[in-house]
Design a protein with these regions (language model features):
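Active-site-proximal, substrate-binding regions of enzyme catalytic domains
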Residues: 1-94, 100
Length: 100
């Protein structure tokens, strides 16, 4: 099963010490580079920064469809846009995102 995540699910679950639930439910979680950068930005420390850098079940991937990302950023931030693009590229079974 391929699962792609945006920043918020990782950040929010890490903040309440329940990030392990993603691993229990899905095994491996894939995040795009923009999500990795958002979570690990030293200027804006957030919950989950250590985990995305150390947990081997959270894997960072590069997106290829930059045209789609550019189109999506007119309505979404970069992390969300890359998460959607990555979900499409990998034919993910689920995307974890807090947008409607």
């Amino acid at each position: 099963m391929i699962i792609v995540s945006d920043t918020s699910p990782i950040n929010n679950l890490a903040a309440i010490n329940h990030l392990y639930l993603l691993h229990q439910l899905y095994g491996t979680i894939i995040i795009p580079e923009a999500v990795y950068r958002e979570i690990t930005d030293p200027n804006f420390p957030v919950a989950g920064a250590t985990e995305v850098q150390t947990f081997d079940w959270i894997q960072t991937r590069t997106i290829n469809n930059h045209t789609l990302v550019e189109a999506l950023t007119s309505e979404l931030d970069m992390g969300e846009a890359e998460a959607i693009a990555l979900a499409i590229e990998t034919q993910a079974d689920l995307i974890l995102i807090d947008e409607r």
